[in-house]
Regions:
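Short, conserved beta-strand segments within well-ordered enzyme catalytic domains
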Residues: 50-54, 61, 75
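Beta-strand/loop nucleic-acid-binding surfaces
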Residues: 58-69
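Basic, glycine/proline-rich low-complexity segments that contact nucleic acids
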Residues: 1-48, 69-236
Length: 236
């Protein structure tokens, strides 16, 4: 963790192959704009494809929703229809609608639900704002002026394809700025990891630790409700 905080090259995402920030055009909410999909591109380090959209003779890159194709039209702003691929303010989207690329703060261009195959649900409209339900079950109330795209981010099922080779996964992790490979704790020496040491491939001691355990020793099963066979039955 301390090495990662320094920000060495092996922990930073590579900028080679990056195209542009994937966010909405900074148009006013009271304006209506009609865009055309010019191209669908892949950006290194990003699982979901991007669409190159033309608005008012300017090009913008937006995360691609499912079912979109080159030549399709998409609407944005006031008066846009609440149909797939269109970008509207949350206050204009009916409850129960599937949405993606949601703004956390009005005008930030989209910060939530941008990964491949992800989507959220417009749960309710209230006085404090619009409540959005995420795939994890968590609910978040955001500003009704925040924009979102109707639909599901394209690229679902990407994780179903196996890497097959360690080199393929190494290139993937490098593009995402992640350290690879990681050595198992029980395979390390005792001076490097609490689970290390001994001529055996098991922990050799209790692996559950408390919630307030200091860093460096906080490894294994952290603050479990149960341990042993009863815990395995619950997981099944």
């Amino acid at each position: 963790v301390r090495r990662r905080g320094r920000g060495g090259k092996q922990f930073r995402a590579i900028t080679v192959g990056k195209i542009a920030p994937a966010k909405y055009p900074n148009f006013r909410l009271n304006e209506h704009h009609l865009g055309t999909i010019v191209d669908i591109v892949h950006e290194r380090g990003r699982d979901a494809p991007l669409v190159k959209a033309s608005f008012d003779d300017e090009y913008y890159y937006i995360p691609a929703p499912e079912g979109i194709a080159v030549g399709d039209r998409l609407e944005m702003g006031l008066g846009a229809a609440a149909t797939a691929r269109n970008i509207l303010a949350l206050e204009s989207i009916p409850e129960g609608t599937t949405i993606c690329n949601i703004e956390k703060n009005a005008g930030d261009g989209g910060k939530l639900i941008k990964s491949a195959g992800s989507s959220a649900l417009v749960f309710s409209h209230g006085i404090e704002g619009v409540t959005v339900k995420f795939p994890s079950g968590k609910k978040l109330t955001v500003n009704p002026k925040c924009r979102a795209m109707i639909g599901i981010i394209a690229g679902a099922g990407r994780k179903e394809k196996p890497f097959l080779k360690a080199g393929t996964k190494a290139k993937y992790m490098q593009a995402h700025g992640r350290l690879y490979p990681t050595v198992r704790g029980i395979a390390q020496a005792a001076v490097y990891h609490p689970h290390g040491g001994g001529r055996h491939q098991h922990v050799g001691r209790q692996s559950s630790v408390g919630r307030t355990t200091p860093p460096g020793r906080k490894v294994g099963i952290i603050s479990p409700r149960k341990t042993g066979r009863s815990r395995l039955k619950e997981r099944k």
